């Protein structure tokens, strides 16, 4: 590894971190900085610690179990003098138990990369590449705009990513794979939004994301929609809370209802419209 690369590994206060240096001698390499967090604050907390210790011109992120392609250094070295604030790359997705098997994970990234490379439309790339990995981010962009990860249990990176994308003066997209994301088969859908507080936390992050884009006239699709649909069957009180706030991310309640029900079954539409009517009537009676 070249000496002009700084690698920061942040341990989220795991109980066996004290033995890491003994078990993994490579952590003592001069370019590598091993940091043990004072608490287990989740990925957003750990990433912010990494930001505080970063010294270089560019930032690249990697999640546990994922990895960069073998010629990663050659790729980033080619673009290190770019005047762009963010450089987006293609990713490859594989299964962790067999990296020769391709996974459909994060397929939406392939689609928005295709859109940009074919049409030059920057908006999907700036607003919907919602993960920190797979891109080179100029550190000055993050510092000048005080961009940080949300220190929440789920979806900590969505607001960071949209801030980076939308506040960048210039972006580039390179038709080259830089990063490989690995996942266990079935892990993405097995119990999504069924853990305690998961729906509330993810919906909150999605709403803040939608609100940012709405305020900047950059809305294309609302991330909150899929969570509101879940709320109808999982958490009516949470649905009531966000129903009252739909005007903050839509031009009107009617536009919101049409968007939420778009593509849904007739049964869902009937139940959702009736429930929405009940909420509206109850609000009128209270006022």
Specify the residue positions occupied by each region the protein language model found.
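Acidic donor-binding segment of Leloir-type glycosyltransferases
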Residues: 1-36
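Catalytic core of nucleotide-sugar-dependent glycosyltransferases
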Residues: 177-185, 191-221, 238-255
């Amino acid at each position: 590894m070249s000496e002009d690369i700084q690698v920061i590994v942040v341990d989220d206060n795991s109980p066996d971190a004290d033995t890491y240096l003994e078990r993994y001698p490579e952590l003592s390499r001069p370019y590598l900085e091993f940091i043990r967090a004072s608490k287990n604050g989740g990925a957003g907390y750990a990433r912010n610690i990494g930001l505080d210790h970063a010294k270089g011109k560019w930032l690249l992120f990697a999640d546990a179990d994922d990895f960069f392609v073998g010629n990663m250094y050659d790729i980033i070295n080619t673009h290190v003098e770019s005047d762009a604030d963010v450089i987006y790359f293609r990713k490859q997705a594989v299964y962790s138990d067999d990296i020769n098997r391709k996974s459909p994970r994060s397929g939406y990234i392939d689609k928005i990369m295709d859109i940009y490379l074919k049409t030059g439309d920057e908006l999907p790339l700036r607003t919907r590449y919602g993960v920190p990995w797979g891109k080179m981010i100029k550190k000055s962009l993050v510092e000048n705009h005080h961009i940080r990860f949300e220190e929440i249990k789920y979806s900590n990176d969505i607001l960071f990513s949209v801030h980076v994308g939308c506040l960048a003066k210039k972006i580039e997209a390179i038709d080259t794979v830089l990063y490989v994301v690995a996942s266990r088969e079935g892990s993405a859908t097995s119990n999504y939004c069924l853990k305690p507080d998961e729906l509330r936390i993810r919906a909150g992050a999605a709403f803040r994301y939608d609100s940012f884009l709405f305020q900047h006239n950059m809305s294309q699709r609302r991330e909150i929609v899929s969570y509101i649909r879940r709320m109808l069957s999982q958490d009516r009180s949470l649905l009531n809370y966000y129903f009252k706030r739909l005007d903050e991310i839509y031009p009107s309640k009617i536009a919101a209802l049409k968007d939420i029900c778009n593509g849904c079954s007739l049964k869902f539409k009937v139940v959702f419209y009736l429930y929405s009517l009940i909420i509206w009537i109850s609000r009128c009676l209270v006022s």
